[in-house]
Amino acid sequence: MERGHGTAIMPMIQKAIHESNFSLSDFTGIAVTIGPGSFTGLRIAMAAAKGLAITHTIPLIGISCFEAVAQRVNQADRASSYDLLLIALNSKREDLYIECRDSLNKKVIPGGAVNSNVFFVKLKKLIDRHTSIRVIGDGGAQLLENAPVDIYDNFLPVNEKDKEPLDATDVAHCAYNEA
């Protein structure tokens, strides 16, 4: 949705709850993304989530978009299939939201909005020719288009599931695991 979040969000929430045959009294928690993302969109979502949480005395948990996407990669994959995980999210601008984690899920380059060329300068300081890099997130293709030739062989093939954008299921799984 490009515009109109403020007027659309509560009716969308009410419709989803109604269609699920649940009521807010059935909820044990509410999860909301805390960014990165559009400042206005984040404020609207956080205000709606906080309003529902306070009104219905339900715990509220904030989830980073990077954390929500990263949780798709299971523990076995982390331990065996790559050295670094790049989470690249579409910012709907020229830059991307990018974060880099190691195979233990520890942040090695903190996330934020960054030009991919600037990011690759930082990344090159962390890798050698044997470092394997997995890319996930809906900005992965854009990131790889700008990858320097001298490190391109470090990147693992991207599967289709890894290209999917963040969705509510990712946020819910992450919140459930953190609760």
Task: Label every model-predicted segment.
Residues 59-165:
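Surface "functional belts" at beta-alpha junctions
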Residues 31-65:
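DPxDG-like acidic metal-binding loop motif
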Residues 1-34:
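N-terminal beta-alpha supersecondary unit
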Residues 160-179:
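Glycine-rich phosphate-binding/hydrolytic loop that grips phosphoryl groups
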Residues 3-8, 39-43, 47, 64, ...:
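Residues at secondary-structure transition points
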Residues 19-25, 54-63, 80:
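Phosphate-handling active-site elements
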